[in-house]
């Protein structure tokens, strides 16, 4: 628990003591103490509606309750300098800022661990994201899903969850047959032979190149093989090459995975059949018109779903149910899926499926990644200038850069449409949010270098009493919020809460820098204290940026 959290907890405890001392409630009737951080600085550091909550129990007007409560509050123990009662009975608390100085040694000691909390308590969580079909390049939706998914994993881990990152490889569907047929056509064409592309073929440049590579390496070897043998090889070859490309792009984008899970393995290990048997034994299926149906309407779905078609083949839903059962059988207590915008209607049937298998519907959360629109020179970008094709993750990394792409994708709520201004993302101005926050970090590093050159050293035991200005306290309060922001972002699964925070921290730093002199040639003690504050700011900025996969440059 960091200093700000300690102060908050101490205040909660002192409010409970004051409520009981004023005779307003007992242990049995006292409500939970809710402390919020007001949006307006004039309303204090913390505020509570406790007086309104107690009105029914105490049978008094909230303002009167607020007066009686605050009269009994031990301000010194609660580290409170001033209290104001506002409106119908809100109680606004203003901290004794001198206590905030203790935040600095806490951050300096923690370094990269600053911001860690234990709200997750080691709970096993699996996040499955990207999971693009291995049949082409990663597009904008996949790129946004990768940025959001990785940031969420980082945040969950920082908040004390045991996180596993998984990519589900769709390698068993008809799309892999189409990949093999497309590769076959490109292979024949590379040999100068005529071969039509399949109706649902893949026309990407990558497939053309794979065909050329095969022709160059193997010559006409596969022409003389049976179609069955040839397509079996092309399936395996095409899948391997596509996955290599996807893995390479994601690795460059700083998105690691702990596990790559093959859909095919669900069939080869008999897991799909086992899951079907479980559903049958539980009475969750029935036969109709030669097909096997899942009673998903029992769990709120708008209609029952087919699991096995009348020709004996499985629907897409069947292996997906088996896959989710397997996740639980691997010991995960919570599943988070990050899906594209076109999967919204799929959520009720998956929640129905896990309930039918005996799990709680809240054990599965699904984040929907909304569409991305690119803009350049004020106009919507539909095609890449480099390839003339749809814009890919690789195009964005090359044209905009990894940091800007990661930050912009994490900057808005995942379920809201994102307009991505490519000109803004590469501009070196304060209007560019990623430049603004990275420049804040570089600026702090510059101050720290200057202090070192002047021999102004500091450590955890440095005298911090010279820190006394309003701007310094504003910065300390903002630094102190970080662990709570991490906890909130994890619990609400909101990576954009981190980008909002880091922008606020950068803004608070710039405000301090414009108002105060960090290094005062006439006051070494003040300079050392302020440099310690700068180091705490630098650590917090870097830690926050790392959560969304963005680097913190020391020079710009």
UniProtKB/Swiss-Prot annotation:
Keyword Cytoplasm: yes
SMART domains in alphabetical order: Arg_tRNA_synt_N, DALR_1
Coiled-coil spans in chain: none
Keywords: Aminoacyl-tRNA synthetase, ATP-binding, Cytoplasm, Ligase, Nucleotide-binding, Protein biosynthesis
Name of a matching Pfam family: Arg_tRNA_synt_N
Top-rank taxon: Bacteria
'HIGH' region, short sequence motif: residues: 132-142
InterPro entries found in the cross-reference section: aa-tRNA-synth_I_CS, Arg-tRNA-ligase, Arg-tRNA-synth_N, Arg-tRNA-synth_N_sf, ArgRS_core, DALR_anticod-bd, Rossmann-like_a/b/a_fold, tRNAsynth_Ia_anticodon-bd
Example GO BP: arginyl-tRNA aminoacylation
Subunit note: Monomer.
Listed PANTHER family: ARGININE--TRNA LIGASE, CYTOPLASMIC, ARGINYL-TRNA SYNTHETASE
Protein name: Arginine--tRNA ligase 1
Organism: Halalkalibacterium halodurans (strain ATCC BAA-125 / DSM 18197 / FERM 7344 / JCM 9153 / C-125) (Bacillus halodurans)
Name of the coding gene: argS1
